[in-house]
Amino acid sequence: MSPLPSVPSRCRAVIFDWGGTLTPWHSVDLEEQWRVFARQVHAEETQALSLAARIIAAEDAAWVRSRTDHSSARLHEILAEAGLDADHLRREAALAAYREFWEPHTFTDEQVKPLFEGLRERGARVGVLSNTIWPRDYHRGVFERDGVLGLIDADIYSSELAWTKPHPGAFRAAAAALGVEPSEAVYVGDRPFEDVHGSQLAGMRAIWVPHSQIPVGQQVSVDEVPDGVAHELIDILGILDGWQSP
């Protein structure tokens, strides 16, 4: 058997976005998630819909800030802004219903495990950098459930940073967690603004995965062109092999 090709020495790590990249893109009713949550807090529908509307507004504002000034947010902050006390008796039941709503949309793409294994066989470290309001433990639980957590060398979530993508600081934090310079890393994601523009701004190469039907309100036009395009996740191995030095 011939030896596996090596990833170029300049590429020591490949870092992935999560939603829409490592998970297949799903169109989700983003308002219904909070109605499901709020109905666990309030049995009376009018009260539940009022709470849901406040949470929707708080979350929308957080994501607008993410796109404009690239500041991060956390789930507990959004709930507090909507007026739900941290010690509310129904809070945990509501969070359980919210997680159950999201579970079908969190399953890891079946190509991820062989992709991660192929990267590690080529000597590349594997990382994750995701814009998220959810805590680290939630995401790691998803990866563990799907049998890929042990293949990830470092994972960083905006909920534990001051910034979101496309801020260069988020990408630098991911590179540092992997022990590489940004110039030695490749970033893979489905969003031209957050993922392609942001990673290139930080000094990384970018591979775009055009899987996602991103809502118009979340789109930001960019001039940057990705260094590679992967229509299937497993295609990333071939792209990296093609970047080998002669």
Provide a role label for each language-model segment.
Residues 1-16, 43-46, 113, 117-120, ...:
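Asp-based, Mg2+/Mn2+-dependent phosphohydrolase catalytic module
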